[in-house]
Structure formats: C-alpha cells, structure tokens
Design a protein with these regions (language model features):
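Active-site environment of divalent metal-dependent phosphoester hydrolases
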Residues: 15-17, 52-55, 85-95, 127-129, ...
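Conserved catalytic motifs of the protein kinase core domain
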Residues: 5, 43, 117, 200, ...
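Active-site-proximal loop/helix segment associated with metal-binding centers of metalloenzymes
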Residues: 124-185
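Conserved beta-sheet core of the metallophosphoesterase superfamily
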Residues: 104-107, 120, 125, 131-139, ...
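Residue-level detector of flexible, active-site-proximal loop/helix-junction positions
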Residues: 13, 112, 228, 240, ...
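Core catalytic region of metal-dependent phosphoesterases/phosphodiesterases
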Residues: 2-5, 9, 14-114
C-alpha cells in the first residue's frame, strides 16, 4: 500500500448542533480531519449517518454542508476514492452524491480485501436477529411508494419535519453508548457470519461506542464511534486496524489496535 492507509469514519451527523459545538463548528472540525486524512489515504470510507437528516428531491437537496461537499469533491478529484454508506439517518441518499461529488454510494454492506485481509463493511443497523421494530421502520423508510409520497410534500415542510424528527430521535436516546461485548446483536451477527465465511474484520458504525472487540476465529469487530462525543475514526495501515481519537493540532490518541 506504499505507506498509505485506508480511513474509516461514521456517525458524523452533520447538521446536528450539540453541547460541544454548533453544527457548523463540527463540520469545520470534520473537514480539518479530512485534510489530514487525504495526505496518506488510499481510500476513505464514511460508513453511514454522515448527516443527521438527509432527503434529496430530484431537483432539490438540503442547503448547507458547503465546506464538507467541497472537500469531498476535491479529494475525489485528486484520485482518492471516497465511499458513502447510507445509515438510518440518511437512508434517503439517491444519485446526487455519485453524480455531483463522484463518491461511491453503498446502500448495503460490502466486502473488500486489503493486503489479503477480508473486511465486511457497513453501517450495521438492522443486521442479524432481533430489533424487529427498527427493521419494520427501515422497511417503511425504504419503501419506494412512501418515498414518492413524501416527495410530493413541499421541501420547506418535509425538510423541516425531517430535521425535527431526527433531532428528537437523537435526544430521546443516550448519545453515548456502552458496548456490551458478545451480547450485542452486532457481535452475535458477526460471530454467526464467521460460521459460514472467514473475515478478518467487521467494520461498523451506528453504535457510537468506539471499540475493537475480539470475535471467534481471530476476527475483530471494529465499531467506529462518532463525531458527536467521541470524534473517533479507524485506519488500516496494511497490517493492523487502529482506532483513534482526533485531536486537532496534536497527535491523535490511539484508543485500540488489533
């Protein structure tokens, strides 16, 4: 990989103001991280919930995020592939980002191989057994008829409503989350998957709890954390996965490695 790294981040929730800063301040911070990452990145994976709410019409998209869009376009134009994954907050990405920014858009988990190591990469929501209420909600959100009906609403109302719902959903739950180990549904999903196929790493967002957790058969589960409370990301350096906390203008803090 010629000393280049693969970068992973998720759950940035752009557009969401928090106790640690305005939405614009967090966007600027993430753009600063992108500036650092592009120096030695071979690829960048943004693994879902990039936006706190996103819904694009055929000819209308939400305003804002100008700095973020500009930097992503610049990185793609420089020859570094950038991958966007839909999450549960931005499931309504369609063709705007591939056409305008040149990113690769993924609606489902993908499998990639880096230096002979197989990676299973996705946002992580709705995988495995259980959580049937959320799975039903996701089916509703991805239903093409219901999407068409929602698109009949004027953007002034639909985007206001979507943002209000998203913020309410976020603050109705704990933003921070403590990972529960093998009892987590996502860990159970990964271990069950390993019964049928070998992987070295499962890389997910969604849980907002940065951790590298050991699985069966020497595999690892990497949960990327978030950019609301933790400001974390992961890199694959060709040998190991590194989970780090971004600290602007300082050396980033290594949280875990494996």
């Amino acid at each position: 990989m010629n000393n280049q790294k693969v970068y992973f981040a998720s759950d940035i929730h752009l557009g969401l103001p928090t106790q640690k800063g305005s939405a614009l301040a967090r966007e600027k911070l993430f753009v600063k991280w992108l500036d650092e990452a592009k120096k030695d990145a071979s690829e960048i994976f943004l693994v879902g919930d990039i936006f706190d709410f996103w819904y694009e019409y055929k000819r209308v998209v939400p305003k804002g995020f100008t700095r973020f869009f500009g930097r992503i376009a610049e990185i793609v134009d420089s020859g570094i592939p950038v991958h966007f994954f839909t999450g549960n907050h931005d499931v309504w990405m369609f063709d705007y980002f591939p056409k305008e920014l040149g990113v690769e858009l993924h609606r489902k988990p993908i499998v990639r191989v880096f230096n002979g190591k197989k990676f299973f990469i996705g946002h992580g929501d709705g995988l495995g057994k259980g959580d049937y209420g959320y799975k039903l909600l996701k089916l509703i959100f991805t239903n093409r008829v219901l999407q068409w009906l929602f698109s009949r609403l004027h953007p002034n109302f639909s985007l206001w409503f979507g943002n209000r719902w998203s913020v309410s959903s976020r603050y109705s739950k704990y933003i921070t989350y403590k990972f529960k180990g093998d009892s987590e549904l996502i860990a159970q999903f990964a271990n069950t998957t390993l019964d049928d196929e070998m992987y070295s790493y499962f890389v997910f967002g969604h849980w907002h709890a940065p951790v590298i957790h050991p699985l069966k058969n020497s595999a690892k589960l990497v949960v990327l954390g978030d950019w609301i409370e933790n400001f974390t990301y992961a890199t694959w350096d060709g040998e190991l996965m590194n989970l780090l906390r971004y600290i602007p203008n300082e050396n980033d803090e290594l949280l875990a490695q494996g």
